[in-house]
Amino acid sequence: MEGQAPSDRVSDRFGKADSDISFRSCDGILFKVHCANLKVCSEGLSPPEGTTTEAEVVSLTEDGATLELLFQHMYPQRQPDLRKFEFKQLADLAEAAEKYQVYTAMEICHARMEEAYPQHPFEVMMYAMKHGYADLMDKSELKALEVSPTTAFESFKPEVYIAWTRYYAQWLDLLASFHNMTTTIFVHSPHSHNNNHSIWLMCVCGSLIRPAALLKLHSICDAATRACNSEVCFYCKRSVDDWRDGELKQGMERMKKLSNFL
């Protein structure tokens, strides 16, 4: 804690003379609020019992716009309509609400983030995974395949990371099945390749490095066809198409939802 700086500007909404604790945003705005409200509405912002806070200022990492919204959810008043704000502002508020466990804000942010999924699927997926919202995790589980194992380890809670790795492993098995199929094409259908035939197969296999690529297999094959001037090996193309319409489709149908691993 520290004292008020000369350059600090006091929030117009949160500048009451009877406040008993002050917070400073990262952009130098002071919010003078009441400990009683913090104790009721938040587990992460209320000071310990018996501490004196009137003359102290607590610096937070959030900006003034985010704290302005966050503190409004700690007072008995009509709450701001979050549908009128840009997505980044909503996402910043959602993170702050989770960080400081402001329950009233957490619930409304969850609802608004779900509504934002069609326009911001990856960001909503990361929010759901970081904070363990099972309904949004299932809704965005295919997007979760785009997360690298390193990012997942660094970003997710331990129980969510374990669930993600088990879900991801199902897709790794499918990816291994695909590459095993491509190595046996010549065994099941002996034939020869010209240069363009080889280019097509190399382009397809080279593009399927991570599980997320399996969802784009059709467009990957189309891109490979263009790369080899539409000269495609009939046997290889049929094998890939059969695997996609058979093994891949069946594997996805019997796959467990991400939330099943929580």
Language model regions located:
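Solenoid-repeat scaffolds in large eukaryotic assemblies
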Residues: 90-93, 105-106, 136-137
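BTB/POZ-protein C-terminal extensions
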Residues: 1-32, 36-40, 46-60, 79-80, ...
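Ankyrin-repeat interhelical turn detector
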Residues: 98-101, 132
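Non-membrane alpha-helical segments in proteins
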Residues: 31-33, 39, 69, 88-95
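A short alpha-helix capping/helix-loop junction motif
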Residues: 85-86, 103-110
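Alpha-helix N-cap/N′ positions at the starts of helices
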Residues: 65, 85-89, 119-120
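Short, well-ordered secondary-structure elements
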Residues: 60-76
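Amphipathic alpha-helical repeat scaffolds
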Residues: 91-95, 110, 114, 122-126
